């Protein structure tokens, strides 16, 4: 494989010295970019973008052609796994993801297959190897998956949910069924991420988007325990380099100490945490990724720059910080503001890496 020309993202994750704080954005390939909207129109719909490795590669690289980002992230969706389990993923315009089938009983869950990463999700592995080849060492490529709890909520609810009524009812009424579902998902995610690593992903992130909706006790038992299983089963070295693992629970600021114990290299933070406090709490164990409120990107460039400066100062000197948003960039953001954000991180962070 081609040598990396810019490895500061991987170095920061592993707490090795860097020249400036690396930066990338969750959903950096997305609807805020006119070139992405054009590609999506050419592909026909969102799933065609995901399932065609050439389109997935094209949109993964678009933000890198526009901005000096320090990492690329595979263009895909967390719901590829439930789709491969036979639930029939589709997208309603303006509605978000839906499933043709849901799971509601122990029998439904027992009948679910564990997808084979190469056979059932081969299009994702093809996308990873295509992107890695096209990147040609520019920056590292991040692979990703949803956490078991987050995937389970979509499978039980049949789509997005505000209150997770059905998923939580199953968790409390029928914990045996929920544990079986989460166990199958943990096995599926482990083999899926390992497939991505073998196809060329140089770091992986587990997105626990809905872990923060749980009580403390339920979070430990139904979300964190299964992420620990995944982390323990991942390939941690490939191609002569360590493969860092990032775990991101949105709304997980209460539980950073517990999350830092599961063996991941890096904790993702949402914008409700103070990154300086997070560093004091867990910085001796893990590196940190985050954590600007994505809606700051609707403000003027000077205000964006000020907020970047505040977060950098809060983290302080030294490595172990990858700058990111506290959640995904939203569709109405002006691409120029995203550029102002990325430039501000590089320009203002050099002083912290003398």
Curated annotation (Swiss-Prot):
GO terms for biological process: protoporphyrinogen IX biosynthetic process from glutamate. Its main location: cytoplasm. Pathway: Porphyrin-containing compound metabolism; protoporphyrin-IX biosynthesis; coproporphyrinogen-III from 5-aminolevulinate: step 4/4. Keywords: Cytoplasm, Decarboxylase, Lyase, Porphyrin biosynthesis. The keyword Transmembrane does not apply. It is found in: Cytoplasm. Its EC number is 4.1.1.37. The record marks 77 as: Transition state stabilizer. GO terms for cellular component: cytosol. It catalyses: uroporphyrinogen III + 4 H(+) = coproporphyrinogen III + 4 CO2. One of its GO terms (molecular function) is uroporphyrinogen decarboxylase activity. Belongs to the uroporphyrinogen decarboxylase family. Homodimer. NCBIfam families: hemE. This is Uroporphyrinogen decarboxylase.
């Amino acid at each position: 494989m081609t040598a990396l020309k810019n490895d500061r993202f991987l170095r920061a994750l592993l707490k090795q010295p860097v020249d400036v704080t690396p930066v990338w954005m969750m959903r950096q390939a997305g609807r805020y970019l006119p070139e992405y909207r054009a590609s999506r129109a050419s592909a026909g719909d969102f799933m065609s973008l995901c399932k065609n490795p050439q389109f997935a590669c094209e949109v993964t690289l678009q933000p890198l052609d526009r901005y000096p980002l320090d990492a690329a992230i595979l263009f895909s969706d967390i719901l590829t796994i439930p789709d491969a389990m036979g639930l029939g993923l589709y997208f309603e315009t303006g509605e978000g993801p839906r499933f043709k089938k849901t799971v509601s009983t122990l029998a439904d869950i027992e009948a679910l297959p564990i997808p084979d990463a190469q056979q059932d999700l081969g299009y994702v592995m093809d996308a990873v190897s295509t992107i890695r080849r096209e990147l040609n060492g520019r920056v590292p490529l991040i692979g990703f998956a949803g956490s078991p709890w987050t995937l389970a909520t979509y499978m039980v609810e049949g789509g997005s949910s505000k209150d997770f009524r059905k998923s939580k009812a199953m968790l409390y009424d029928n914990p045996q069924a929920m544990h079986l579902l989460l166990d199958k998902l943990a096995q599926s995610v482990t083999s899926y991420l390992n497939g991505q690593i073998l196809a060329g992903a140089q770091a992986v992130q587990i997105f626990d988007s809905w872990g923060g909706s749980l009580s403390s006790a339920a979070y430990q038992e139904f979300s964190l325990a299964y992420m620990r299983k995944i982390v323990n089963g991942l390939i941690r070295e490939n191609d002569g380099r360590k493969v860092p693992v990032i775990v991101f629970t949105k709304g997980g600021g209460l539980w950073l100490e517990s999350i830092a114990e599961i063996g991941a290299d890096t904790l993702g933070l949402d914008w409700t945490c103070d990154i300086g406090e997070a560093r004091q709490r867990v910085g001796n164990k893990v590196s940190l990724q985050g954590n600007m409120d994505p809606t700051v990107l609707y403000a003027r460039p000077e205000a964006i720059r000020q907020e970047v400066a505040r977060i950098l100062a809060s983290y302080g000197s030294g490595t172990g910080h990858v700058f990111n948003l506290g959640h995904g960039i939203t569709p109405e953001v002006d691409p120029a503001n995203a550029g102002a954000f990325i430039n501000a991180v590089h320009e203002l962070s050099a002083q912290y890496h003398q």
